């Protein structure tokens, strides 16, 4: 189908031969001819409307003068429209021709669709308006019906009340009629009332007739006598009801319904409250805090699709949503808020005063850290350490030229990584001790990393320069590989060559420390509550829990209530490193604190609080969090008991249960970490329990239950515990050097490993003939082609390069004699244990099996 636009459009024209025709103003017309198949055509008139609202006016005005009748009213308007209308069609015709020549079929179709859409929108709007009107009419009708129904019910209620009143009145009249004494006054009274209402002539006469009948009072004594006799008449009952009349049930019911309607219709003013919401809360408690009914909160949950009870616990997010839904303001409060304001209290700059520097001595084991500190302190600590190695963190103070320096000595053994990390965190300056006759070792590198992680400056102390093979320059060069640039190599790190044995250059080392401290401008506020870090903790017999702490801010005094980790207590005494009791501990002072409820973990921060109640609250919160972490860790590691047992059975892993008791928390931590590193895929150490303090009977009971061995590090078992262990057959091992402890546990765990099976190839033999011998079975006549064959060796039968049997050699004969072995090139006879499927051409491979004990 094609559309062609014809050029012979009929336009508005004025011709003498034709009648004057006028098109509608504001409408441009054009003709479009459509060509269909089979030669069919169709002409379509296309109109373009320009002004929508002036169409009717322009169409009606020019028609008026064309009417021949009514000449009188139209002489004035007739000439006016003609001069306006006659020239208008000419330019309009020219415009319509131009527009139709420019409009394409797509544009025409688009305009047609736009008109259709407009009509559809109008139709839809009209439908919506009708629907809204119908809905409003239905709503009005429903309200009218409700009003009519309410009026009808009210009328019925009034009619019912009226009927009840009439029935009651008739009953009273009937009762009075049956009673002779009361009958005449009742009739007279009724007649009087009727007469008064009518206002009749006999009113006076009737009123006069009432006077002689006035004494009606004998009725009451009669009723009382009848009541005393136990007889109850209708009259007496009715008269008694009138004397003590109460509201009827219907009246009470109507009153309650009216009260309920009033309560429902009454708009109560909503009081918005600030609801404090903890991390978990029950629905009942939340409703109480919102001053709402718990039933309403439960209904809200039911609307959300959740069936809840008032005693159910919900989380803080859900509680906040409920509070907001009920129009209240939620204030979230976490359990950790109990720790707010405990640490990091801002001090005013004018309150800060200079404090001594805290120096940590770090380095590899046996590089002379403790010896250097002994030389500085002029003491002998190394002699008191088991094995000559430091296994605790020691904190000391040294006076130099009127200035105080606090030293912290850390272990250098690989097992004490956590101790070194804690020492670096609590320090201001780190002294890296490196032996001049040695090189940079693994723990040296680890100490460098700890110091860099803590962001503290490093001073390199090159020790043992008094030895003949000392090479300090080699140490400086190796430190460059780990980004430690000393001053002599163009860096900014101070380095001092010292000798702890001879005391060489110790004064230079102290001067370097004071210089570095002066650069750092170390200050603290001593006039505030104390806070710091726990360096070490232990359980001492006779003194209880003892914690070595380093005061970092404020002043610690006896009597202060402190919280250290998950433990709290009131400070009973402060003891310095020389065992002397002190009254105060200013900033940068290491002291031993007595009075805690239990030994805290090394590395925990401590702070002084106002009251014991707050200290107890913080301690309980931290203990609860620690328990939750432990449970989550165990659940994540082991899962359920069935899963754990199935994993152990499938993997074949063996466990070595241990109970570890030590003198201080730091040593226990180091031992546990060292033993956990010994574990493999086949065997691992399981720490049933670890703690600081002596070995007690409870430890023996736990070991008996879990079938564990007890390890004591620098502690002993009391007599009761030893007796219980001997009776239960529990082994207790004592150690004072961590090397020996780790080596013994490693050897014991190695014994749990299954031995390694090793095969040694002996030789090959080819079957030449198969003999069937009575009482023996099939015997293979073979020639040894490679190696040798031994009696009792393991054999494999190979056929077509495929192993079809593996077993042991039963007999090995040569010329009817049993031999121990047959070398290559010789012939022999062989028989297998419990196997006789041998053929000529098979190859027998002989091998020896050895079981080798494995070690970790």
Curated annotation (Swiss-Prot):
Which key words tag this protein in UniProt?
Cytoplasm, GTP-binding, Initiation factor, Nucleotide-binding, Protein biosynthesis
Q: Which PROSITE patterns match?
A: G_TR_2 (PS51722), IF2 (PS01176)
Q: Which GO terms describe its cellular component?
A: cytosol
Pfam families recorded: EF-G_D2 (PF22042), GTP_EFTU (PF00009), GTP_EFTU_D2 (PF03144), IF-2 (PF11987), IF2_assoc (PF08364), IF2_N (PF04760)
Q: Where is the composition biased (Pro residues)?
A: 68-90
Name the segments for region: Disordered: 24-266
Q: Which domain of life is it from?
A: Bacteria
Enumerate composition-biased segments (Low complexity).
181-190
Where is the tr-type G domain positioned along the sequence?
354-521
* Positions of the UniProt region annotated as G3: 409-412
Record carries keyword Protein biosynthesis:
yes
- Binding of GTP, residues: 363-370, 409-413, 463-466
Q: Where is this region: G2?
A: 388-392
Q: Where is this region: G1?
A: 363-370
- Mark out the compositionally biased spans (Basic and acidic residues): 108-177
Note down the stretches annotated as region G5.
Answer: 499-501
Q: What is its main location?
A: cytoplasm
Q: Which NCBIfam families match?
A: IF-2, small_GTP
Concerning its family, UniProt says: Belongs to the TRAFAC class translation factor GTPase superfamily. Classic translation factor GTPase family. IF-2 subfamily.
Q: What does this protein do?
A: One of the essential components for the initiation of protein synthesis. Protects formylmethionyl-tRNA from spontaneous hydrolysis and promotes its binding to the 30S ribosomal subunits. Also involved in the hydrolysis of GTP during the formation of the 70S ribosomal complex.
Which HAMAP family does the UniProt entry name for this protein?
IF_2_B (MF_00100_B)
| Name the UniProt record assigns to this protein | Translation initiation factor IF-2
Its source organism is Chelativorans sp. (strain BNC1)
Q: Which gene encodes it?
A: infB
